[in-house]
């Protein structure tokens, strides 16, 4: 009987752990904006932001691993992707940063560490500049150089453009995103062309130097 009770207790603990890490989806709304958020895990807050033109489902395995390690992981889908809705014309990085800030604020779990991959690094930086009270730290993952060559921006646009022949898209992805010997075909899908262009414009509409003051803003 005692063994049965212990076994039941262990099962309940395991089930509770799985439940704590269970992946859920919700819509965070403000003004006319709707942000589709994937959430999982319990613990200190981490926000994952994807590359330009890509959605946050690229982070599926990373998010699951972080949740298992005891973190609360939020992945706001950028505007124009999945259920996320909001203007994509004449916007700036300040607008995209506000989307992230609202998601963190609504979570009400204290300041977050924001991880920004590639283009996502600019949104992460701007969130820290504009909303320092909501940001505990910023992780720049494969962040762009301070002087980003125009050709590289063109390669990102080509990668996201479904009207471009597949061979050309693969060549562009291989050059800008993938190491030699890695297969870029896994990224043939998962692109959002209109959102990608909106993100390009958002970055162009601010002074790059504005993004580099985030360390001072967080002090």
How should these model regions be labeled?
Residues 7-15:
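Bacterial N-terminal signal peptides
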Residues 30-39:
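A short loop-to-beta-strand scaffold at the N-terminal edge of the catalytic core in hydrolase folds
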Residues 38-83:
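Conserved HGGG/HGGXW glycine-rich cap/lid loop of the alpha/beta-hydrolase fold
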Residues 75-115:
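Active-site loop/oxyanion-hole signature of alpha/beta-hydrolase fold enzymes
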Residues 113, 136-139:
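Residue in the alpha/beta-hydrolase core beta-strand immediately N-terminal to the catalytic nucleophile
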Residues 116, 120, 124:
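Gly/Ala-rich beta-loop-alpha elbow adjacent to hydrolase catalytic centers
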Residues 125, 129, 138-164:
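Flexible "cap/lid" loop of the alpha/beta hydrolase fold
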Residues 150, 163-218:
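Conserved alpha/beta-hydrolase catalytic His-Asp/Glu region
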